[in-house]
Amino acid sequence: MSVQSNSNSSGSLDGAPSCSQFSTGSPTPGSVSPLDIFAPRRHKEGMDELHSLDPRRQELLEARFIGAVSGNTGGSTGSASGGPKGLNNNECSSHSFGSLGSSSDKESETPEKKHFESSRGRKRKVDNQSESSQGKSSGRGPKISDYFDFQGGNGSSPVRGLPSVLRSPQNSHSAPGAIVRQNSSSPTSLCFMDHTMNLKQLSSRSVQTDLTLLKLAALESNKNLDLEKKEGRIDDLLRANCDLRRQIDEQQKLLERFKERLNKCTTMSKKLLIEKSTQEKQSCREKSMQDRLRLGHFTTVRHGASYSEQWTDGYAFQNLVKQQEWINQQREEIERQRKLLAKRKPSSTPSSQSPTPNESKQRKTKAVNGADNDPFLKPSLPTLLTVAEYHEQEEIFKLRLGHLKKEEAEIQAELERLERVRNLHIRELKRINNEDSSQFKDHPTLNERYLLLHLLGRGGFSEVYKAFDLFEQRYAAVKIHQLNKNWREEKKENYHKHACREYRIHKQLDHPRIVKLYDYFSLDTDTFCTVLEFCEGNDLDFYLKQHKLMSEKEARSIVMQIVNALRYLNEIKPSIIHYDLKPGNILLVDGTACGEIKITDFGLSKIMDDDSYGVDGMDLTSQGAGTYWYLPPECFVVGKEPPKISNKVDVWSVGVIFFQCLYGRKPFGHNQSQQDILQENTILKATEVQFPAKPVASNEAKAFIRRCLAYRKEDRSDVHQLGSDSYLLPHMRRSNSSGNLQATPASPAPSGIISY
């Protein structure tokens, strides 16, 4: 009964570790044993449990500890035998440390459990006795040898070589801490010590190498050398870094000084440019005031309820008019005297010879006495002159008429010169008036870059200023587009879209015969600007108004440059049709006809992309736009579908410009307005071009113009054919005798001279 009570009390210790916790493999270096983790707690619990056992239980445990030495040899044989004991030991050894403190349903059987279950079976039913595991035990109490039946294993494994007291269920629940603490007096502790030493030896052997002390010393010396090199390299890099930082600081300071100096230079440049522009404006106004008296000025004249400006000539024109009137009076007087002289012209026949002195006396007497009874007094007949006297007077009159004619030619030349100067004067007056009314007249700096100097011209919705680019240090032409504030938003958007389209087309162009577009920016919602290349000279239209016409060589040079630019526009992808070629859009760089030209104003340009351009050309969506004198007949055709155009539109414009340069007039609709041209279908009727007799032009030039002004666009040359035309080839020379073009070997021309 005491055994059963002890087994019940020992069986209540469910938190003690089982024997499977000691069945792990070989410990690795640095691993911590579960016995070491739970040793203090188990020792305390084991000591309390030992004191609570009865004396008989203590005697049994002491006898078990004493027989542990002999149990080590017997354990190997016991583990080799099969049966339920070996199975239970394997089950116990298969548990992991995760089952610590848990009561498993596969708990190992002990003699106490057998005895307890058999005793319980007697009280209940006989049928329950067959359910006990591994046979029935007798009614007597457990023997000491029953506690050693569960010592299995061959003794070679550290886990299986553990003493039986550790594998016993009762002792595993009773005093695990006491077993661990008995390391010096117990043989089991000695076994643990030997096993631990073996593990340490194995772990130490696994890290041993074949390195000798010399090799270690060499490696250490090499490592030290490498370390010294690295430290030296680090020091060098640190010094270089410090030097670079110092240089960066110096360069930064130098850059700041340069920036400050640049700002000072920019400020001074702005100041000097403004001073120069102010002086130029002042001198222009003074000169304009002086020319007002000499050349004329505008006066306001009232016509009913309206006012209009009327031009009044200055004293220079008035003097020329007076001189012209005097010359006319002198010419009339000479003509009158010549008529009188003709009456006194002597007769060429002998009968009409001069009378004798007696006959002349008789005639005088008759005249005084009133002979022939004539009641009226008759004037005396003019005295006939001799032949010598007549020729002498005739020669004098001819010389006087010739002198008057020469003076009249001089006056006419002076009048033409004054008219050209007057045109400049009128243009300057309008420019000054527009500049004074402009909001950009006080030299503002647009976009913090472009300093406006003075107004160049003004159009319908734009102003063009000469400006100075402070960043690039160059002159530029700034075109300021100002929208009408009273416009609808839709109209403003269309205008802005049109300007952006012109900017996108013009921005991608890069050719020496095309004005470059530098920049584009906005000032406000109703104002935006485009920055263009600045040219000192005027346009071709102003030149023709001043000089009427030019020589064929000069006109041919201009046409060659225009065709060169058109070839570039048709070689890029997508190709571009200018559509608005006219003398006003051709700038003379030097202001003369013998220099370079540049094409500008791509506002009406057409892009010939793959979507809109076909075999017959592209649709003209902006019919009615452009300058009518320079557009071909296909642009005026009205039908259900819009007309098709191609680069032959620009070829027609080239022919009109060439004709105007040679003859000083337009070939079609010269004195007509655009409205008259549209109403009278002037261009649609222009089937053939007519050349004036003067000035004289070569047949090759006329043939070239005919090829450009062919009425049907199918018969007209395109831009590529025009570029390879024989008339424009530079190696052709004109023969002085025949007037035809002859091919001559090109001789090396001196530098700076263009040979045509």
Swiss-Prot record:
GO MF annotation: an example: protein serine kinase activity
Pfam families associated with the record: Pkinase
Listed name of the protein: Serine/threonine-protein kinase tousled-like 1-B
Xref: InterPro entries: Kinase-like_dom_sf, Prot_kinase_dom, Protein_kinase_ATP_BS, Ser/Thr_kinase_AS
Region (Disordered): 1-56, 69-185, 339-375, 734-756
Subcellular location: Nucleus
Protein species of origin: Danio rerio
Extent of Polar residues compositional bias: 735-745
Annotated catalytic residues: D580
UniProt keywords, alphabetically: ATP-binding, Coiled coil, Kinase, Nucleotide-binding, Nucleus, Serine/threonine-protein kinase, Transferase
Biased composition (Basic and acidic residues): 45-56, 104-120
Chain residues that bind ATP: L456, G457, R458, G459, G460, F461, S462, E463, V464, K479
Sequence ranges of Gly residues compositional bias: 72-85
GO cellular component entries: nucleus
Documented EC number(s): 2.7.11.1
GO biological process terms held by the UniProt record: chromosome segregation; intracellular signal transduction
Coiled coil location: 243-268, 397-435
